[in-house]
A protein has these predicted regions:
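Short, amphipathic, aromatic/basic-enriched membrane-interface segments that mark the entry/exit
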Residues: 1-3, 89-95, 216-228
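Hydrophobic transmembrane alpha-helices of multi-pass solute/ion transporters
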Residues: 5-77, 86-94, 251, 255-306, ...
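Hydrophobic alpha-helical transmembrane segments
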Residues: 6, 31-32, 65, 100-105, ...
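Hydrophobic core segments of alpha-helical transmembrane domains in multi-pass membrane transport
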Residues: 6-18, 33-42, 68-76, 107-108, ...
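Membrane-interfacial helix-loop connectors
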Residues: 37-47, 58-59, 110-147, 151, ...
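Alpha-helical transmembrane segments
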Residues: 59-70, 175-191, 246-259, 334, ...
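Transmembrane helical segments that form the transport core of multi-pass membrane transport proteins
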Residues: 81, 88, 99, 103, ...
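Juxtamembrane and boundary regions of transmembrane helices in multi-pass small-molecule transporters
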Residues: 133-138, 142, 154-155, 164-165, ...
Length: 448
């Protein structure tokens, strides 16, 4: 049974990784893979509790999906009001090297509150108004990808993988930020410093202060755009605060935030005749935004997480964890390898697999284990979980296809895979390894 489940997962994974070759949507493959693995487990596993275990796995998966749908809706709502133009319209520098640093910093902090893909889309579209030279724009876009992935790794709501780890209790918001902010910053600073030498130190041609034309209707004034941007970002940042205050899971906080934003924008719609008179298809209302939610991505997450859940329920991941404990037994090596692997395959199933392989350890149980120092790495907010969060997020920058941000930039700017491998991958690797070194120093010197 177990070899068959593993074979199905590997074959499905190959089809997902080769989506651009097979031209079969990865969401369809993920759904089929999940159904096939659970079917094998049901027919050959002889587990009398399979119905209960299936419902448990579906419940865990749906918690993450509800959170993602809420976050995606709020971000799209901000964009529909032109809220992000408030940021892009204030970029006026003409020096290319200064511009690169400015964009990297904005991306780093923006992706901590928004998802990496949305942040990358906004910043790459901005580049088209700022940089005319195609190859120079590729360099800028590559730095944006690195900054987006690194920025998403230190925030509990910055990336799908951090959301997963945070919602399952593997990490807490405060400790995640305290442990990973500096390593993630270093992982951006080093590549950006090197990449800035690739661009000519002269003024950019035809730099436009009006950076991003999002198609936002003129009837939405700058004050309203700023108001929606502030309220939307505060609503997203409210989620970890809500969890800390109430003890309820993050998806409940996201539901509260989305409900508040929905009511607020409905009141604005009702009171502003100019918005009511807009063409119905472009009205900035949640009911319209929800129609544009990326459902294939949601279905992909369902398929992947349920497939990994089947491997966990069947004991496959436990066996893998036992093998790693016996043959590797070093958290930096394990997490570092996972990070490099995440540049080739999707980091969502990688992190989900690790969460299944290594359940959060109880402090007392870890202290009483045969190797307490190693076991302590797997308690809540332990060293392994912070390493995994960092490596899975930042490691996706090593290849252009290693992250959603990279794939988006590749599609928008037609960045060549070989060009990125030759010009950017070593830069990303230098930042990745430097960040791991910072985590090691934090652990050794101050015990973080």
């Amino acid at each position: 049974m177990i070899p068959t489940m593993i074979l199905l997962f590997v074959v499905g994974y190959l089809f997902i990784a080769l989506e651009h070759k097979t031209r079969i949507d990865k969401s369809a493959v993920a759904l089929l893979m999940a159904g096939a693995i659970w079917t094998v487990f049901s027919l050959l596993g002889n587990d009398p509790h399979i119905q209960h275990e299936l419902v448990d796995q579906l419940g865990d998966t749906c918690e993450i999906l509800v959170f993602l749908i809420g976050a995606m809706t709020i971000v799209d709502l901000i964009d529909s009001y032109g809220g992000f133009n408030v940021i892009t319209d204030h970029i006026t520098t003409r020096n290319k090297r200064k511009l690169m640093w400015l964009l990297a910093i904005i991306t780093f902090f923006m992706s901590a509150a928004l998802d990496n893909m949305t942040t990358t889309i906004i910043m790459v579209m901005l580049l088209r108004r700022l940089i005319a030279n195609k190859k120079e724009r590729w360099i800028f876009a590559s730095v944006i990808v690195i900054a987006a992935n690194s920025g998403g790794a230190w925030s509990p709501i910055g990336d799908v993988t951090t959301i997963m780890l945070w919602m399952r209790g593997n990490v807490t918001a405060a400790n995640l930020i305290a442990n990973l902010f500096l390593p993630c910053l270093v992982s951006v600073v080093i590549p950006a410093a090197i990449a800035s030498r690739y661009v000519a130190d002269r003024p950019a041609a035809a730099v436009s202060a009006k950076a991003l034309a999002s198609g936002c209707p003129e009837c939405i004034g700058p004050r309203l755009r700023l108001f929606i941007l502030i309220v939307g970002v505060v609503s997203l940042l409210f989620v970890p605060v809500f969890k800390s205050l109430t003890g309820l899971p993050p998806y409940m906080g996201m539901m509260v935030s989305l409900g508040f934003m929905w009511i607020l924008t409905e009141i604005i719609y009702d009171r502003k005749r100019s918005i009511r008179n807009m063409e119905e298809s472009i009205q900035p209302r949640v009911s319209k935004v929800l129609k544009h939610i990326d459902m294939p991505t949601i279905l992909f997450f369902i398929g992947i997480l349920m497939a990994v859940g089947a491997l966990q329920t069947g004991g496959v991941l436990t066996d893998m964890a036992d093998w790693l404990d016996k043959n590797v037994h070093e958290v930096f090596t394990i997490a570092g390898a996972i990070g490099i692997l995440s540049s080739v395959v999707d980091n969502v199933p990688l992190v989900a697999a690790c969460m299944g392989m290594y359940p959060v350890a109880d402090v007392a149980t870890a202290a009483a284990s045969a190797d307490p120092a190693f076991a302590q790495s797997f308690v809540a907010d332990g060293l392994f979980w912070h390493l995994l969060t960092y490596c899975a997020g930042v490691g996706g920058s090593l290849l252009i296809i290693g992250s959603a941000a990279g794939v988006v930039a590749m599609g928008l700017e037609k960045i060549n895979f070989g060009w990125y491998l030759k010009r950017i991958s070593l830069l990303a690797l230098s930042g990745y390894l430097a960040g791991i070194a910072v985590i090691w120093l934090e652990h050794v010197l101050i015990g973080l």
